[in-house]
Every structure is written in C-alpha cells, then in structure tokens.
C-alpha cells in the first residue's frame, strides 16, 4: 500500500479535452460501464469516502473528473458508459470524448478498466480493450465486486477472464478487487506506482 494516494484531491470536472488541465505530467484513467463500482474503487484506492461520487443511478458520472495526487501525477475518472437511460445527446458526446482522450492525451500513462466480476467482458469492455490496444495505451483490468463470491470462486472466475484476456489482448494485466473488503489495494497501487512514478520513495519524499 502506498499512502501517497491518500492525498488525492478533486481538481475539476471537464466535459471535453479543451477544458481539461494542461496536458503535462502523468495521468491514469479509470474507465468502465455504469454501475461496475468504478467510483468505489477510486475511493478505496485513495482511502477516501467520497472523493469520487458514488450513486445508485448508473450513468451519473457524465464528466471527466480529475484528481491530482501530486503536481505531476493524477487519477482521472472517465464517464460511466452504456446505460440506456442516459440521454442520447450525452451518449453521443461520450462516444466522441472518450476516443479523443485516449488517443490525444499525452499525459495518459495507462487505463484501469473496471469490470464487474459477475459480468465481465461486455461489448463496451471489449471496445475499450481494442481501442487501447490499437492506440498502444497500457491497460490493467480491475475485476470488482469479488466479495460477491467465495474466495475460491472469485479466483476461478478471475482466472477465466485472465485466460480470455491473454488469448485476445496479450499484455493486458488483471486482478480481482473488492472495495468493501479492501481486497487487491496493494496490487492496484503497485500498478499505479509503475505508471505514475509514485513508488515508496516518492511517497516518503513529499
């Protein structure tokens, strides 16, 4: 566990790239379908209850939310996608903004794709995997809500997803995760450390 993530704070919500902070430093983006536990995962990784807003209404996150950790490193919460009740105009805007961000943001160092372990590899997940693979953006899959299964069953389901990832998207890494049980925090921090350059030494020096 790296406590440097606990100092993350909210900076801004941007509807598109033009209103994002300057394209510098390092960013890791969190993406995922609506209601997969993306906001809860960010809150757990930063040890904060409400840094990223959680809602029982899927599709509530409609803007790009930026959470700086240091002057040179930030987490980015991308809009939750794929919920039918989101207005069509909003969906069209998301469909434009997401590929623009992935392809055009120089600060982007990696994407954490959040999937519900109960319903992994949806059409949206596969689209994200294809996009990131085509653009060359490193991707780590966070299989959330592992607490809904017994430990052995969660591990087996994760390994099944891992086999599919290796077969279709070589190089993509994955792990199981539970926000409520704080399962997988150390492993996720290690991946973020690598992408953001925030190893233990960075945390001690600030």
Swiss-Prot record:
Q: State the similarity comment.
A: Belongs to the TRAFAC class TrmE-Era-EngA-EngB-Septin-like GTPase superfamily. EngB GTPase family.
Q: Does the keyword GTP-binding apply?
A: yes
Gene Ontology, cellular component aspect: cytosol
Q: What is this protein called?
A: Probable GTP-binding protein EngB
What are the protein's GO molecular function terms? GTP binding; metal ion binding
Q: Any idea which UniProt keywords this protein has?
A: Cell cycle, Cell division, GTP-binding, Magnesium, Metal-binding, Nucleotide-binding, Septation
* Entries under Pfam families matching the protein: MMR_HSR1
Residues at which Mg(2+) binds: 39, 61
What domain of life does the UniProt record list for this protein's source? Bacteria
The cofactor required is: Mg(2+)
Role, per record: Necessary for normal cell division and for the maintenance of normal septation.
Tell me, what is an example of a GO biological process annotation in this record? division septum assembly
Detail which positions bind GTP.
32-39, 59-63, 77-80, 144-147, 177-179
Indicate whether Metal-binding appears among the record's keywords. yes
Residues in EngB-type G domain copies: 24-198
């Amino acid at each position: 566990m790296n406590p440097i993530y606990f100092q993350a704070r909210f900076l801004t919500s941007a509807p598109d790239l033009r209103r994002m902070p300057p394209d510098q430093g390092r960013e890791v983006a969190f993406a995922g379908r609506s209601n997969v536990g993306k906001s809860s995962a960010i809150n757990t990784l930063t040890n904060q209850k409400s840094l990223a807003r959680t809602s029982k209404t899927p599709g509530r996150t409609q803007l790009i939310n930026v959470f700086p950790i240091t002057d040179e490193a930030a987490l980015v919460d991308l809009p939750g996608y794929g919920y039918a009740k989101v207005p069509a105009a909003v969906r069209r805007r998301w469909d434009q903004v997401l590929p623009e961000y992935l392809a055009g943001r120089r600060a982007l160092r990696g994407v954490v794709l959040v999937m519900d372990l109960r319903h992994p590899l949806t059409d949206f997940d596969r689209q994200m995997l294809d996009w990131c693979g085509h653009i060359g953006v490193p991707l780590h899959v966070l299989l959330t809500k592992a607490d809904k299964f017994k430990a052995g069953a969660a591990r087996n389901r994760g390994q099944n997803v891992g086999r599919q990832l290796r077969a279709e998207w070589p190089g993509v890494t994955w792990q199981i995760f539970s926000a409520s049980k704080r399962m997988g925090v150390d492993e996720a921090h290690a991946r973020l450390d690598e992408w953001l350059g925030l190893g233990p030494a960075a945390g001690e020096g600030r």
